[in-house]
């Protein structure tokens, strides 16, 4: 690596860890900025502008260690970071405006308390993102996509207190000048289920090295689904997945058995306002810390960390990278953006590998913190079962489901009157197109505006109690909640109580929706509804025109529906009545002949 590229890398890492370190220097009376991802990006840009290149490389890891010591105890970032003892240097981060200082203090620690979620921001795509796991993933990626070798024998112990990981300073070309002195007060203590007689005289040390092939899967023959199978411990864990997802997934599922339909993952919430958000209230006041915002931030951190670990030098400034990721796409790739985090995350966190990562992370935590109340006394087989359950639930209940924006996110007006509950599970999905709006919406602002427009039309012109559809699918990667899973809609006349009405925004008479929108309707939405007991396993899919005289959902889309496995071809389409030319001219411009009016 050239000296210039090395300096660039050190500056980028320094900026990130200065952001952590500023938590230790609160300023009284700081002004408040809206809790937007754009505000975080502006703060990063300010840090990048003020940080001298000669200092950034030396203070990066130390700032993260300092911030780690100021919050809830999590030994993994401290254990993984390279750098000298904090006592060897005095740190002097650049001064920021009171507004940016206050923002950094407010968002860099994630937490859930009294039904409120803290440390989260609203992103341009409409999603809410926890900043802490995002920053952890960026830092792990800047270190290089590294693999941590666990002891080959599950009963082996870690080095005694004060032991130095050998050759650590040569593990990454970006950090060759960094001497390692990785200490932990707990690493020399035996795991609760380790016998003294089992400890090999030659202790296996942890080795951290860059992974040239991405995430490594170890022990591929392990069978962790059966409690009667003696599990073999994984031999490596990936540091990127460890600090973003694996630790929190493992600890979450250690807390108690979860049902198949309610894993406690991904609780959504509502902002006090969308233009200047300040307070985020969870829809479930008893939600676990693994909220939708946390999982979004963790996935974003893992994806961007993976990108940073592979992108050639010089690496982009973090503010530039985040601006692209939460905008049009990283490096001009519209697929690599926050709208499609779940699809991209599914490729990065394949279930067998994620099981190994969660299991290995729990093993590492058990060695680092033998007195951990959740890990104490847990056998390897028990940890394997927890990891298997965690990976399965995360993959099926989160990655395999569409991202659904709740009503409050698009600014829905309240329901008029009292909604009528559905008798679940239902047996049908009824597919519509909106016709008006005719153009597919490809960003949150336009999709949300379309939702509000349709709701106003359904309320004020049609005289309905709410927007008619159960769900509406945009071309921005998101599904928008209409009446939702539990309330009778107004979408398919005489059939509203028998099925969910799902509309795709756009006119699909001659063109097809995006592949992402089709996948959400064909695969993701029904899969998750069946899994949650909302839709019958033998459900059927019908086009609107099969039940009502209408051209909906458009010829192109309907012909596509006919090729889908769940399509019920036994119900023949009903031909739409055509109005005379005179009556057509009398129709309001906002209500075309083929528009979806039940």
UniProtKB/Swiss-Prot annotation:
User: Which reactions fall under this protein's catalytic activity?
Assistant: Hydrolyzes the link between N-acetylmuramoyl residues and L-amino acid residues in certain cell-wall glycopeptides
Which EC number(s) are documented for this chain? 3.5.1.28
List the subcellular locations: Secreted; Membrane
Is the keyword Signal in the record?
Answer: yes
Region span, Disordered = 172-194, 212-233
Query: GO cellular component annotations, sorted alphabetically?
Result: extracellular region; membrane
The SS bond pairs are 441-447
Grouped into one coarse class, the protein's main location is secreted
Q: Which SMART domains match?
A: Ami_2, PGRP
List Phosphoserine occurrences by residue: 261
PANTHER family in alphabetical order: N-ACETYLMURAMOYL-L-ALANINE AMIDASE, PEPTIDOGLYCAN RECOGNITION PROTEIN
Q: Which family would the database say this protein is a member of? A: Belongs to the N-acetylmuramoyl-L-alanine amidase 2 family.
Q: What does this protein do?
A: May play a scavenger role by digesting biologically active peptidoglycan (PGN) into biologically inactive fragments. Has no direct bacteriolytic activity.
Please identify the protein, giving its name as recorded.
N-acetylmuramoyl-L-alanine amidase
């Amino acid at each position: 690596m050239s000296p210039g590229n090395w300096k660039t890398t050190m500056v980028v890492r320094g900026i990130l860890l200065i952001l952590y370190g500023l938590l230790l220097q609160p300023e009284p009376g700081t002004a408040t900025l809206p809790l937007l991802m754009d505000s975080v990006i502006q703060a990063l840009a300010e840090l990048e502008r003020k940080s001298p290149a000669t200092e950034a490389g030396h203070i990066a890891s130390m700032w993260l260690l300092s911030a780690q010591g100021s919050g809830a105890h999590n030994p993994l970032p401290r254990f993984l970071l390279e750098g000298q003892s904090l006592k060897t240097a005095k740190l002097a981060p650049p001064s920021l405006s009171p507004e940016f200082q206050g923002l950094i203090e407010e968002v860099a620690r994630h937490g859930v308390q009294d039904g409120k979620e803290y440390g989260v921001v609203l992103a341009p795509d409409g999603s809410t993102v926890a900043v802490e796991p995002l920053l952890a993933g960026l830092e792990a990626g800047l270190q290089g996509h590294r693999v941590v070798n666990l002891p080959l024998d599950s009963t082996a112990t870690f080095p005694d207190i004060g032991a130095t990981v050998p050759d650590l300073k040569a593990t990454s070309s970006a950090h060759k000048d960094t001497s390692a002195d990785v200490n932990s007060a707990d690493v020399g203590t035996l795991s609760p289920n380790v016998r003294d007689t089992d400890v090999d005289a030659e202790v296996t040390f942890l080795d951290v090295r860059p992974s040239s092939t991405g995430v490594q899967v170890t022990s591929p023959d392990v069978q962790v689904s059966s409690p009667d199978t003696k599990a073999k411990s994984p031999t490596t864990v990936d540091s990127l997945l460890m600090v973003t997802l694996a630790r929190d997934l493992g600890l979450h599922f250690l807390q108690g058995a979860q049902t198949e339909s309610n894993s406690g993952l991904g609780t959504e919430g509502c902002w006090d306002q969308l233009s200047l958000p300040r307070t985020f209230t969870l829809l479930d006041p008893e939600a676990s810390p693994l909220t939708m915002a946390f999982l979004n931030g963790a996935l974003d951190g893992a994806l961007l960390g993976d990108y940073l670990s592979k992108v050639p030098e010089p690496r982009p400034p973090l503010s530039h990278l985040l601006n692209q990721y939460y905008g049009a796409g990283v490096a001009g790739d519209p697929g690599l953006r926050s709208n499609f985090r779940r699809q991209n995350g599914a490729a990065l966190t394949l279930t067998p590998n994620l099981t190994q990562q969660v299991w290995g992370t729990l093993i590492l935590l058990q060695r680092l913190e033998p007195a951990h109340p959740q890990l104490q006394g847990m056998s390897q087989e028990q940890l394997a079962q927890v990891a298997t359950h965690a990976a399965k639930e995360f993959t099926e209940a989160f990655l395999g489901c569409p991202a659904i924006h709740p009503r409050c996110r698009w600014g829905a007006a309240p329901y008029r009157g009292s909604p009528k509950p559905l008798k679940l599970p239902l047996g049908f999905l009824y597919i519509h197109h909106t016709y008006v709006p005719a153009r597919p919406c490809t960003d949150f602002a336009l999709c949300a505006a379309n939702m509000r427009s349709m709701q106003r039309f359904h309320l004020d012109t049609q005289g309905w109690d709410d927007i008619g559809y159960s769900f509406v699918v945009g071309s921005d990667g998101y599904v928008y909640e209409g009446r939702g899973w539990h309330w009778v809609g107004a979408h398919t006349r005489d059939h509203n109580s028998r099925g969910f009405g799902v509309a795709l925004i756009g006119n699909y008479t001659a063109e097809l929706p995006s592949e992402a929108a089709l996948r959400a309707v064909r695969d993701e939405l029904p899969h998750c509804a069946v899994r949650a007991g909302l839709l019958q396993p033998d459900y059927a899919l019908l086009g609107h025109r099969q039940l009502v005289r209408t051209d909906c959902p458009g010829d192109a889309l309907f012909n596509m529906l006919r090729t889908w496995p769940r399509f019920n071809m036994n119900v023949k389409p009903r031909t739409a009545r055509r109005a005379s030319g005179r009556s057509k001219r009398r129709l309001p411009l906002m209500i075309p002949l083929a528009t979806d009016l039940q």
